[in-house]
A protein has these predicted regions:
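A short glycine-rich, Lys/Arg-flanked "PGG" loop and its adjoining helix->strand segment in the class I
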Residues: 124-136
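Class I SAM-dependent methyltransferase SAM/SAH-binding core
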Residues: 46-100
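Conserved Class I S-adenosyl-L-methionine
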Residues: 52, 123, 189-260
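Short catalytic micro-motifs in class I SAM-dependent methyltransferases
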Residues: 115-116
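Short alpha-helix
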Residues: 170-185
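A conserved beta-strand element that flanks and buttresses the S-adenosyl-L-methionine
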Residues: 112
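Conserved class I S-adenosyl-L-methionine
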Residues: 1-40, 54-58, 74-78, 82, 141-163, ...
């Protein structure tokens, strides 16, 4: 099974859970995105890896037209329901993977991608595609969970996420992401870090973790080293486990060939 079909399987089977997930509906990362794009009216905006469509819904306040893109048809149906329920008519839906975007060169004013980049099989190709379809000096805003700049924490984070979600590819460090952006032709304009606050029970339920595997995952949280518990704020909470992932939000501008 390839990575694309893994993502479609995981998110296709559990699209309703993501549509009702509080950390996907709205959290600090979406608030930061709105602050980053507020004050500008965009002609065409595109949200890549839109999932249930909440970021694209937010962009509709700042854009004449929004394109919501995702590889999973069930997720796009949830997005369509979200827009219909809010009587939003200027959002178009497109099904595609992030590494192959069916859009002409240089016509998009704003691209966003929230909590999806760690699922992309080729993050570099996604950035290259974003650069291709953005107009000169167009804006790219990415928000995603990131690994700490600590090898033990980076390994633990990615191992635990892959056990919970077979479509997981990699949570990169902030340094890695910013280097990839620079190499793809983007200039960092501003950045902000925040946290994604989670509860273990809803975290495993969202991807339908096999009940027989839940105890193994829980044990890896409770028996994690002090370093891991500090990085991810792991603690017992009302018969559950609370924790948080670091999240990086960056706003970048496409650098034109004449200025690179």
């Amino acid at each position: 099974m390839n990575t694309k079909s893994k993502a479609q399987q995981v998110f296709g089977e559990h699209a309703p859970q993501y549509a009702s997930s509080s950390v996907h509906v709205r959290d600090d990362s979406l608030d930061i995105i709105e602050k980053f794009v507020d004050g500008t009216k965009y002609n065409i905006a595109m949200d890549i890896g839109t999932g249930a469509g909440f970021t694209a819904l937010s962009l509709s306040k700042f854009s004449t037209l929004v394109i919501a893109s995702d590889p999973t048809s069930q997720m796009l149906q949830q997005a369509y329901n979200t827009y219909s329920n809010n009587n939003i008519k200027h959002i178009s839906i497109v099904q595609n993977i992030a590494e192959q975007i069916p859009i002409k060169d240089g016509i998009i004013d704003l691209i966003t991608c929230r909590k999806a980049g760690h699922h992309f099989s080729n993050f570099k190709s996604y950035l290259e595609e974003s650069h291709r379809i953005l107009r000169d000096n167009g804006t790219l805003v990415i928000a995603d969970s990131v690994s700490p700049e600590d090898l033990e924490a980076e390994k633990w984070f990615n191992d635990i996420e892959l056990q919970r979600d077979l479509s997981h590819i990699y949570n990169r460090t902030p340094t890695t992401i910013k280097n990839l952006l620079h190499n793809a032709g983007f200039q960092l304009q501003c950045e902000k870090t925040t946290r994604i606050y989670l509860q273990f029970s809803s975290w495993v339920a969202r991807t339908g973790v096999n009940p027989q595997h839940i105890n193994s995952l829980k044990q890896q949280f409770t028996e994690a080293s002090a370093n891991i518990k500090k990085h991810f704020q792991i603690q017992n909470s009302d018969n559950d486990i609370s924790f948080s992932w670091p999240c990086l939000v960056v706003k970048c501008a496409k650098i034109t060939k004449t200025t690179r």
